[in-house]
Amino acid sequence: MFDKLAAVAARYDELTELMAQPEVATNVTLLQQYAREQREIEDIVNAYREYQATQRAIEEAEAMLEDSDPELRALAQEELETQRKRLASLEEQLKLLLLPRDPNDSKDVIMEIRQGEGGDEAALFAADLFRMYTRFAESRGWKVEVDSLTENGIGGIKEVIFQIHGEGAYSQLKYEGGVHRVQRVPATEARGRIHTSTATVAVLPEVEETEIEIKPEDLRIDVFRSAGHGGQGVNTTDSAVRIVYKPGTPEEIVVTCQDGRSQIQNRERAMTVLRARLYAREQEKRQREIGASRLAQVGSGERAEKIRTYNFPQDRITDHRIGQNFSNLPAVLDGELDKIIEALIIYDNAERLRASGVST
């Protein structure tokens, strides 16, 4: 591990020297390339140099233990214990930093929420989840754009497709894909019986046009009059867009977008969703081919996987992937997802470390 760290630090210094050269400083493309590469390894280099400084501090403290002054020796012992703890912490941090990064972590995200089993109560729960993710995004200053929304007429959501734009959006929300289950007494339940309902969530990284090739001949594009929420017509022009990829084949994908201001905007958004779905399909195929373990796929987003239960009577949220419970359910549904996401990231990192076999 430390040989690799030394090589990364040497490359960082080399990049600094390269960017100072006149022929590079005047070449914008090359300068940006070097700057991007340096940013990607900056955290590793900073942690490694702090590790080296901590090692030196330990050596100095050990030398002070030989001093004749008992007070100085006591101070040295205290410093030694502090620095050794810091060294162990930095070593774990470096192991994590050396793990391959998910190339999608910095991307924006596309989310799809659909009501599952449970009728109207499932649709109401889907609306709760949509509000939860919207509030979570807003608390971070991220932008939310709705591509398509189908309501059930009583405040519930049958299906919603939306995009979240913000730094690291996918890295935070990629763990939300799967089946979410709610246990509560519906407002319409006169006898106070607890009902169980579900909603499915899909999480997709937004994909650049250059990352996925889509042939025009594989598409059928329909335009129609946009409908308002609840099915009410609101538009006198054919602004809504439906894109069908490879219609009539097993590979068919249908994407509809009608919440944009124009047909052009709806078409662009629909293509964005289509690219994301095709990318996700390719990723899932690749994972199956290499036999990736389920433990290493906490954020796989498979819709058949029950990932979390929201138990209202007991004010308890259980994430089944990590076997951990969380309280204060109303706050979580109001967007306070930080503790849950942090626990999932810690679990995922630990599993990746175990699978990688990184050692010193």
UniProtKB/Swiss-Prot annotation:
GO terms for cellular component: cytoplasm. It is found in: Cytoplasm. Methylated by PrmC. Methylation increases the termination efficiency of RF1. Pfam families: PCRF (PF03462), RF-1 (PF00472). The keyword S-adenosyl-L-methionine does not apply. Its main location: cytoplasm. InterPro entries: PCRF, Pep_chain_release_fac_I, Pep_chain_release_fac_I_sf, Prokaryotic/Mito_RF, RF-1. Keywords: Cytoplasm, Methylation, Protein biosynthesis. The modification N5-methylglutamine is found at Q232. The keyword Transmembrane does not apply. Disulfide bonds: none annotated. It comes from the Bacteria. Belongs to the prokaryotic/mitochondrial release factor family. NCBIfam families: prfA, PRK00591.1. Peptide chain release factor 1 directs the termination of translation in response to the peptide chain termination codons UAG and UAA. This is Peptide chain release factor 1. The lineage of its organism: Bacteria, Bacillati, Chloroflexota, Chloroflexia, Chloroflexales.
